[in-house]
Amino acid sequence: MGLSGMSANMEFGKAFTTRPTGLHGYYKYTPAVINKVDRTPAGVTIVQGETMDQCAIFIALAKKTFTFNNKNEDQYIQYATDPNIIAYGELPSGAATEGDGYVEFNIPLKYKNLTDQPTHIIVVCSSSKYGDYMTGGVGSTLYVDDLSLIYDGTPTIWE
């Protein structure tokens, strides 16, 4: 059975009220060639059977929860423009990790301003960057370990 035509309602956000400066952790990623393509985001070119999958790890702070259906792209969260998102950060590269060990990462949160307080946190770790479009490589594997929020330093302003 393929994934084409399947849909899911997703709910993002858990109650959370502090203002960290980033997300720290370790990951190990082994991608597969993308062999399942239902849809792709505008501006993204994927050649089924040739394009390597990518992982996605990101964090957002919000003023609400978000519920959307993965088949309705109009409901997808627009992190840069949604006024309910107050901070966002993502792993810069979703490429494969080298060797057998885990790779350390630090994702700085970029705040839209220094005054808004979050009510919810969103953390997403996906072995297929476009999994919400039902597109990815069967067999892509992402392991994540020892996630922690960082509270040191001055918050970065989103520009």
Language-model features, listed with the residues they occupy:
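Short coil/turn motifs at secondary-structure junctions
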Residues: 30-32, 64-66, 112, 128-130, ...
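Generic structural detector for well-ordered beta-strands
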Residues: 15, 106-110, 148
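Residues that flank catalytic or metal-binding motifs in active/ligand-binding sites
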Residues: 19-21, 53-55, 103, 138-145
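Extracellular carbohydrate recognition and processing domains
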Residues: 66-118, 137
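Extracellular-facing segments of soluble proteins and assemblies that are Gly/Ser/Thr-biased and enriched
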Residues: 1-67
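Extracellular carbohydrate recognition
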Residues: 99-101, 117, 128-152, 157-158
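Terminal processing/anchoring signals of secreted or surface-associated proteins
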Residues: 25, 158-159
